[in-house]
């Protein structure tokens, strides 16, 4: 028999590791349950009714888990919370609220109830936008009222609290953090897909700023570089791959279907696929001049063999033919592998929906009234931009992005000159054409077809002045044409480079907006750091208030004389210059907020680095930065000792954040 697990025989770090593993297991089960709840909220309500028994059992289990963990997490929140415990608490609250709301909607559902009313209740379509949270923060300089609507609003507010932590009471900060936590419970608590209406990737976070601080700036300021930064930390992109044969591959493994129904569903899917493929043919593209040049080059090369001497031009043609054949001609552009345009994506979505309906009718005998079908008319009435945000079942977000890029290129490359230079093998094709012309010119005798060219090249010996002027005009026209062609090529290449650079820049924004985004770890980490900082201050105040002996000598008449004596004694002694760096670091450690802790990293940085990040992330105005820099400079004489008697840290008579921060 193995010995039972005894926590007293285990080291604290091992206990912490075991606790983290258990919390991660519970969090994973919660996320699975939340995912199933989100599916039931969107599927046919008559189908979801068959799962009401399992849903009730899971809802009771969520309540039991919440009752088991909440007491310990509440006591831990007063000391130290971690992003993991915060994520578990938010997920528990979200799972309990959404699961019970779904259960209530299913209980109210009748046999002939409208799916519209069910979806309006489960998806919250009948109520207003839930992503509006009022937050009030009371500081020593006044009250601040804000509204949280986006995820970056939460991060900005927490950074502002971190900067103003010196002028914010711990009790007021705790009240504000309760409102912030309620917003996080409705958003980050799901741990699933981020709604596009609450995410704005054009607002960089503090991690984006730190990344820019360790990369080359190329002479640009941090604010200018932040203006073009696309944040991928508050929300993170997820690459979604959709397989066209996914339904055919998974049908044989569906549980609860008889063999006859499964075979009938597979046959219906096969027939539907054949019908859609028969209607998706298109005319072949006519060959261009490049194909004719390749055929001519192939004919010349095939006519040559090892027993014939190869002219110099033929070797050049062979080399260019090698480069053209070794290139990736099938993927002239990446977008050819995806849908040609948005209409093709819509056609693909229609074919997928046709196959899905055929399978449902063959397997279940009815067409499911899912959320996207019930509100299909509303989705169809959306404009192109909103339809891109909604997405589809058969087209991945990357397909939409490639279709948009292809449409952009097709629009800008409609000019013949740009279209001629758009191919990656254009230079080789032009060189092949020139080599073929030179080869033909070398093979032709001087007296045949080249008589005209030689007559133009040779100087006019016996002709009249009219012939000289005609030859001069012809040479001038040829020179103008060559210059114009070279200028057009140069301008076209520059335009193509500008177009490619613009597409690359805009592609990053398209990917962040259209790709599936999940919640990152920035918001839980920032919330935990700020909350722990104010919780430490609260514990310090409580320990001070519970001191065994409190001597209150404020009414003693000798207190003022003692104060003057101590002040005079301190002013007579100069601080040793060798102690100034340590005192400066101690000052920064006291002034810094709880969010930035670069001084505690493995590769520790000076404490003033954290103050720099704190100031820059809140967008402090330049003149306030200059005031802060002057304050940090050493003060001469006794200016540092000027303060009112027995009022070391007070803000009487001050109002406003900036004056209060200046006094602090």
UniProtKB/Swiss-Prot annotation:
Residues 281-292 have a biased composition (Low complexity). GO terms for cellular component: host cell nucleus. The keyword Zinc-finger applies. The keyword Zinc applies. This is Tripartite terminase subunit 1. One of its GO terms (biological process) is viral DNA genome packaging. One of its GO terms (molecular function) is zinc ion binding. A zinc finger (C3H1-type) spans 205-233. Its main location: host cell. Keywords: ATP-binding, Host nucleus, Late protein, Metal-binding, Nucleotide-binding, Viral genome packaging, Viral release from host cell, Zinc, Zinc-finger.
């Amino acid at each position: 028999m193995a010995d039972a697990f005894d926590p007293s025989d285990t080291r604290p770090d091992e206990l912490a590791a075991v606790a983290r593993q258990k919390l991660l297991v519970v969090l994973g089960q919660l996320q699975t349950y939340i995912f199933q709840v989100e599916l039931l909220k969107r599927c046919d309500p008559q189908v979801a009714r068959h799962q009401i028994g399992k849903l009730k059992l899971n809802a009771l289990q969520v309540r039991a888990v919440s009752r088991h963990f909440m007491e310990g997490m509440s006591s831990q929140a007063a000391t130290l919370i971690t992003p993991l415990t915060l994520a578990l608490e938010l997920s528990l609250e979200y799972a309990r609220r959404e699961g019970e709301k779904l259960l209530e909607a299913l209980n109210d559902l009748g046999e002939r109830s409208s799916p519209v009313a069910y979806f309006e209740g489960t998806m919250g379509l009948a109520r207003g936008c839930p992503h509006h949270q009022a937050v009030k923060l009371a500081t020593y300089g006044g009250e601040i009222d804000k509204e949280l609507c986006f995820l970056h609003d939460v991060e900005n507010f927490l950074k502002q609290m971190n900067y103003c932590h010196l002028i914010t009471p711990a009790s007021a900060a705790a009240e504000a953090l309760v409102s912030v936590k309620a917003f996080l419970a409705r958003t980050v608590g799901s741990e699933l897909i981020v709604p596009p209406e609450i995410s704005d990737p054009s607002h960089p976070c503090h991690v984006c700023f730190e990344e820019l601080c360790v990369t080359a700036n190329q002479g640009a300021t941090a604010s200018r570089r932040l203006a073009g930064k696309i944040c991928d930390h508050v929300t993170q992109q997820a690459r979604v791959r959709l397989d066209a044969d996914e339904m055919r591959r998974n049908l044989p493994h569906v549980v609860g279907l008889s063999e006859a129904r499964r075979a009938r569903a597979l046959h219906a899917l096969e027939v539907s696929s054949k019908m859609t493929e028969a209607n998706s043919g298109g005319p072949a593209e006519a060959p261009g001049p490049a194909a004719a040049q390749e055929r001519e080059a192939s004919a010349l090369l095939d006519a040559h063999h090892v027993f014939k001497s190869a002219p110099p031009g033929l070797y050049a043609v062979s080399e260019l033919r090698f480069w053209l054949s070794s290139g990736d001609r099938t993927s002239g552009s990446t977008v050819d592998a995806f849908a040609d345009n948005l209409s093709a994506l819509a056609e693909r979505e229609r074919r997928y929906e046709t196959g899905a309906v055929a399978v449902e009718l063959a397997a279940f005998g009815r067409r499911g009234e899912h959320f996207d079908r019930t509100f299909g008319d509303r989705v169809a009435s959306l404009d192109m931009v909103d339809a891109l945000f909604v997405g589809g079942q058969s087209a991945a977000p990357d397909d939409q992005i490639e279709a948009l890029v292809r449409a952009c290129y097709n629009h800008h490359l409609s000019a013949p000159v740009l279209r001629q230079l758009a191919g990656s093998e254009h230079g080789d094709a032009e060189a092949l054409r020139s080599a073929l012309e030179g080869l033909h010119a070398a093979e032709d005798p001087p007296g045949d077809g080249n008589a005209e060219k030689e007559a133009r090249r040779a100087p006019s010996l016996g002709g009249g002045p009219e012939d000289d002027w005609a030859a001069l005009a012809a040479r001038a026209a040829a020179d103008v044409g060559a210059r114009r062609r070279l200028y057009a090529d140069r301008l076209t290449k520059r335009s193509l480079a500008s177009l490619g650079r613009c597409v690359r820049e805009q592609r990053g924004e398209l990917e962040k907006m259209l790709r599936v985004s999940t919640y990152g770890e920035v918001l839980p980490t920032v919330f935990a750091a700020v909350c722990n900082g104010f919780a430490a201050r609260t514990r310090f105040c409580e320990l001070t208030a519970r001191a065994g002996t409190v001597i209150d000598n404020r009414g003693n008449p000798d207190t003022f004389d003692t104060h003057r004596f101590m002040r005079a004694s301190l002013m007579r002694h100069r601080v040793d210059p060798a102690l100034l760096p340590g005192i400066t670091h101690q000052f920064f450690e006291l002034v810094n907020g709880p969010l930035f802790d670069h001084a505690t990293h493995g590769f520790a940085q000076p404490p003033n680095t954290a103050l720099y990040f704190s100031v820059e992330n809140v967008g402090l105005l330049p003149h306030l930065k200059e005031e802060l820099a002057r304050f940090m400079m050493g003060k001469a004489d006794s200016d540092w000792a000027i303060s009112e008697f027995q009022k070391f840290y007070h803000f009487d008579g001050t109002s406003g954040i900036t004056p209060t921060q200046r006094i602090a």
